Amino acid sequence: MAVEYLCKVCRGHLKVKTSIVLAASKTNSPSRGLIFLNPKIGNYTTTTHPSFQIKEGEEYIYNCPICHSQLNSTKYKHLVRIIMIDDLGKEYNIYFSGIAGEKCTYKIRGNKIEEKRGPDLNVYNKYFDIPEEDRKYL
């Protein structure tokens, strides 16, 4: 079984061939389009149509292209959440920054960080590197 990526709401498959496909838009802007993300954790290459340019430093709203649900986390500001199922059938929450150019990814199973990558981790470690009972105060 190959690694799969799913919408956190409808559980529809987001990985097509070699990319994770999401819809992206900017708040208060008509600019929107599809973005193809590399599914390898730690690889931050993206592809968009030439008419839809992602601007570094700006925050985007990410939606499932199937059910159109917003994938940006309501719990962790500036992070986006999707689900990953590995080749053994284990399920993980994948969090990545919704701010273009920020490079950080968290792979979490239950309350345990299984993997974290990227030079911008220090911005978001506050959400994950504290005891569970204290997270409610964030």
Give the ranges of each region predicted by the language model.
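Short cysteine-rich clusters marking metal-coordination/redox-active sites
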Residues: 7-10, 64-67
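Short Cys/His-rich "knuckle" micro-motifs
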Residues: 14-21, 74-78
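Short cysteine/histidine-rich metal-coordination sites, predominantly Zn2+-binding motifs
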Residues: 22-32, 79-91
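Short, structured motif recognition centered on aromatic/hydrophobic residues
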Residues: 31-40, 92-100
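Short, intrinsically disordered, charge-biased short linear motifs at domain edges
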Residues: 45-56
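Preference for intrinsically disordered or flexible, low-complexity segments
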Residues: 65, 88-138
